[in-house]
């Protein structure tokens, strides 16, 4: 695992946040976009439409920017940078994830795993999903 180089252990700003989840049958991208003091959380599913991969909005919700920062800092998402959860050799399939984020103006967080997740991953994913509602 890569050494975490962030001196400040809290996220103060979010410039980019995409948490991708891949299973055998589904690819989801949970994206957080900041607009002033509001945060829009969107969940997209990759679907093939007319033989072309398209990013289709399936869930969306809005909360305060402060609430998103609380979630990410509570579960120490900044410490996930460099996480690489290699797939267990005796597991046939499972769930893979990738986090790509830019925070605190220019700090990149990149984490990836397959059936092995950083501490707090499931709680962050659940908290983000609870903000969203299905889009018709």
Region spans (language model):
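Short, well-ordered, aromatic-rich surface patches in folded extracellular/luminal domains
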Residues: 1-24, 29, 56-67, 71, ...
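Short, flexible N-terminal segments of the mature chain
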Residues: 29-49
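Short, cysteine-centered beta-strand-loop-beta hairpins and adjacent loop/turn segments enriched
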Residues: 49-51, 106
């Amino acid at each position: 695992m890569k050494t975490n180089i962030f001196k400040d252990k809290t996220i103060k700003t979010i410039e980019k946040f995409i948490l991708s989840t891949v299973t055998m049958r589904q690819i989801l991208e949970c994206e957080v976009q900041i607009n002033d003091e509001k945060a829009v959380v969107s969940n997209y599913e990759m679907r093939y439409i007319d033989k072309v991969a398209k990013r289709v909005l399936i869930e969306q919700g809005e909360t305060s920017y402060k609430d998103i920062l609380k979630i990410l800092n509570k579960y120490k998402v900044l410490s996930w940078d460099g996480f690489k959860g290699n797939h267990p050799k005796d597991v046939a399939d499972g769930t893979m994830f990738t986090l790509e984020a830019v925070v605190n103006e220019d700090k990149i967080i990149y984490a990836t795993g397959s059936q092995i997740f950083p501490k707090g991953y499931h709680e962050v994913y659940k908290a983000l999903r609870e903000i969203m509602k299905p889009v018709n």
